[in-house]
């Protein structure tokens, strides 16, 4: 009777259109219920029965209605699933497979089966890649996934590396060596093999891509020649090897090993500037004034060099700092080191006055055993020799930026525009509230930004610096010249690491076109998109492997009285994020560990402070001592508490 009733259909339609709806992202909890977060402002409760139809992170449309005097959201339509391709651990019961996604807020197993053609007998504990194929909001009875790739078994000590690389869909191995070109004979090369070029790297480095030579002009100025390995002599644009390098975009440096952008025969041998080996290079020569300024005699040219020494950062630093032990192999090399130190000092002084110099932060290096276990974590401070190489590389990248800008008007540029115009007022408010005069319009200029940074660098704490960081933009890769506020420079284009960065290979080809007076083509924007995306993925992979190794390393410290010095890097509503200064690990201090009475405490991300009874007890940038309360291996997270 009611089946085709138009009035009933109309009423249904009316009710549907009148039911309030919202769109948002599902946030799961460990207790079965969840929330629908709308625009980051408002959230609606999702009861456990409705949560069974969705997954944490799903973007959905939901209807709103009231139950027991509480407004709740009932997910109705899936807009964008949180999971599509993911990694997880396989469970096996009675030959039926399921997979638990490797994510801190996804605990439920998803039924799955291997795709056709995947011939692997999956066992419980195996790591695998899966693709979601069914979702309850799409009319399916439940969640379902296809297993598309076996990663490794549950007992593999190297799982942190293989799982992370699979998660981000990154290569596991160096590319195969394939046919390469002979160096282009039409590009004349100057013979610089008689000059005392040196390389300075870590002791374990095999892919040496920069060599340096300095000449004293006798009038207070110095002439610096930077010679850079020349992979584009062997890799033609558009060749199969070039396509491989373009896709990989960077050498991927992970704790314990790297996955090169180019075949190791090229990166570690044919192109590597090994001592006493004749190598083709792209070179830049520039005069550095007594005040550290770069003269306008910048010249790029192709050459051949023969490095006279493979020097090591720590040994060179020890010698320059007067620490007994290592000595330069000859007087000529000793003279080069001394002249390079002069270059470093005058350039560093110039950049302090006219640009910006990053504060020195240590690097943390994992020392690993054969099974991937962490034997120790070594803190490597940036020393004199590191600064020498850094100053020479920055100077040569400024030279490339100027030449590419003035001769072509394009290249691969690193661009950073300082404050986000939409957020600069927030920064002004924070600065003024802390006694620093600030003007939004001025802060958006390079000079104004540099002035503020110099002032903040002179402050006794990092509090203000970390507070205004949220209002700044991220560095970008661009084909058109633009300023780099972070370095305090009008333009910056890297070309000094072509073995490990595809963008530097592109700039090499453009610089060679200028040298040969040939027409050059502006790089496609797709190249910068690929570079930015790969840089993001490589950084995430490095962080993920690091988190896993930190969890392994700190596991046996949990529950002990061992104290660690830490710096507060973020304040959230739920507590503090801190970095352990002795090893670089990031840990979380939950609010209840700070003060037992929650109502007496305010953790404010807005002000970057923790207040107890109205008194500020912690600020972002503060140092404190902590102990490790717990290490959760399944989520690779470290929980700390303030030391008593």
From Swiss-Prot:
Its chief place of residence is cytoplasm
- Top EC class per UniProt? hydrolase
Cite the entry's keywords alphabetically.
Cytoplasm, Exonuclease, Hydrolase, Nuclease, RNA-binding
**Taking every annotated instance into account, which residue ranges of this chain make up the domain S1 motif?**
561-643
Q: Which reaction does it catalyse?
A: Exonucleolytic cleavage in the 3'- to 5'-direction to yield nucleoside 5'-phosphates
EC number from the UniProt entry: 3.1.13.1
Show the GO cellular component annotation of the record: cytosol
UniProt record, GO biological process: mRNA catabolic process
Q: Which GO terms of the molecular function aspect are on file?
A: exoribonuclease II activity; RNA binding
Tell me the SMART domains matching this sequence. CSP (SM00357), RNB (SM00955)
Q: Residues in domain RNB? A: 189-516
State its location(s).
Cytoplasm
Role played: Involved in mRNA degradation. Hydrolyzes single-stranded polyribonucleotides processively in the 3' to 5' direction.
Q: Which family does it belong to?
A: Belongs to the RNR ribonuclease family. RNase II subfamily.
**The name this protein goes by in its record:** Exoribonuclease 2
